[in-house]
Amino acid sequence: MLIIISTPIGNLGDITQRAAHLLAQADIIACEDTRQTRKLLSLLSISSSAELWAYHDHNGAKVRPKLINVMKAGQQVALASDAGTPLISDPGYKLVTACLENDIPVTAAPGPTAPIVALTLSGLPSDRFSFQGFVPQKKKAARDALEESHLLTMTQIWFETPKRLAATLKMMAGIYGNRYCVIARELTKLHETLYRGMLADLAKQFEVAPILKGELVLVVEGADKHASQVSIEKITELLRTRMHKMSLRDAVEEVEDLSGLPRKQIYQLALSVSKNET
C-alpha cells in the first residue's frame, strides 16, 4: 500500500495524529530529502524503524520500480515531501499512477498545503481557483505561461522565489494588467507575512526592498469576465494556436474556459479561423 502523508509547512503543531502514526508504522518512507525527513521525525518525536528512500525528480524513474516491487511484496510505503502535501509541485503523481497500474492500494493522510493556506488568507475568491506551480525560470517560458493563463477568470496561485519576485511581478503586471495580488511568505512560521497590493505597486516595492529569503506563494486576482481587454484578435489567436494541435470542438471548449466568453461567439470565431486556414 502507498500512503500519501502531509507534513507541516512550518508549524510542527500542524502534524496530524494519523500522519504521525502512519509514519511510525511505515516500512519505507519515500521522501525528497532523507536528511530533512529524519530531522522532522526527530523534532516530532516519532519513533520509526522505517527505511528512508530518497525519491525526487532526479531519481524518480530509477526508484519508482523498486518501490512498486516492495509494495507488491506487501510492504507499506509512506510518501512524504519536505513540507506540505506530496504531489503538489513534485513527482509523486507518477508513483501514484504506477501504483494504480499495478493494482496497489493508495490512500492519503491529508494535512497542510501552502497553496490552500495562502488562498484562505488572501481574501480573494476561493470558489474557483487555478494552481499553476512555480513560474518557469526561463524568461520566455515564464512569459508563455503567463500569456497562457492571463484570461483565466478564477483566482490564480503561483510559487516563486525571492530572487525572481520583483521581475515576475513586473511581468505579471504587463501581461495580466494591474490586478490585486497577495504574497504569502513563511506560512505558519514565526515570521509569517502577507503583502497585499496591486501587481505594479508590489513590483516596485520589492525592487527597492527585496525579500531575501523565505518560501513565497503568490495569489493573484483572476481576469474580469467582462473586461474589454479580451479582444477578438486575442481570442482568434488562441483558437488558431490550439486548432493546430487539437480538434475544433476541443479548441472551442478550452478557449471558452480561458476567456469566459459565450461558447456560441467562440464557435463562430473558430469556424472563421478554420475557413481561413484552408
Model-predicted segments: where are they?
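Glycine-rich, flexible N-terminal cofactor/catalytic loop recognition
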Residues: 1-56
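A contiguous loop/helix-start segment that scaffolds small-molecule binding in enzyme catalytic cores
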Residues: 2, 76, 155, 162-278
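Short active-site oxyanion
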Residues: 23-29, 103-107, 155-156
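Structural motif
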Residues: 32, 55, 80-82, 107-109, ...
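Alpha-helix capping/helix-boundary segments
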Residues: 35-37, 84, 114, 164, ...
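Conserved helicase motor
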Residues: 54-61, 135-138
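Glycine/small-residue-rich loop that forms an oxyanion/phosphate-binding "nest" at active or ligand-binding sites
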Residues: 64-113
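Class I SAM-dependent methyltransferase SAM-binding "motif I" and its flanking Rossmann-like core
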Residues: 94-152
